[in-house]
């Protein structure tokens, strides 16, 4: 696991109040991790702050899995 995923996993665990070990790239934010729309908004904001990037609303709405968010973030920080 790379550093970016580990940072992102820690944020997801904190914001969604789940165990880090339960989060994989294939975890669904809503189905597996129990996120609702407010959780998703707070998570996107936390990622923007932590990573120093901006995630457009229309893009954030496309994040179904942790992988979706990870791939977008990776494209912005590398």
Swiss-Prot record:
Entry-annotated residues carrying O-(pantetheine 4'-phosphoryl)serine: 37
Entry keyword Phosphoprotein: yes
Domain Carrier, first and last residues per copy: 2-77
Molecular function GO terms recorded: acyl binding; acyl carrier activity
Compartments where located: Cytoplasm
Lipid metabolism recorded as keyword: yes
This protein's UniProt keywords: Cytoplasm, Fatty acid biosynthesis, Fatty acid metabolism, Lipid biosynthesis, Lipid metabolism, Phosphopantetheine, Phosphoprotein
Pathway(s) annotated for this protein in UniProt: Lipid metabolism; fatty acid biosynthesis
Role description: Carrier of the growing fatty acid chain in fatty acid biosynthesis.
Entry protein name: Acyl carrier protein
UniProt gene name: acpP
């Amino acid at each position: 696991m790379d550093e970016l995923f580990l940072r992102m996993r820690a944020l997801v665990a904190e914001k969604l109040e789940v165990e880090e070990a339960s989060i994989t790239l294939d975890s669904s934010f809503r189905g597996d991790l129990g996120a609702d729309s407010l959780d998703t908004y707070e998570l996107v904001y936390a990622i923007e702050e932590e990573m120093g990037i901006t995630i457009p609303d229309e893009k954030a709405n496309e994040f179904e899995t942790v992988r979706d968010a990870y791939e977008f973030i990776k494209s912005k920080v590398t």
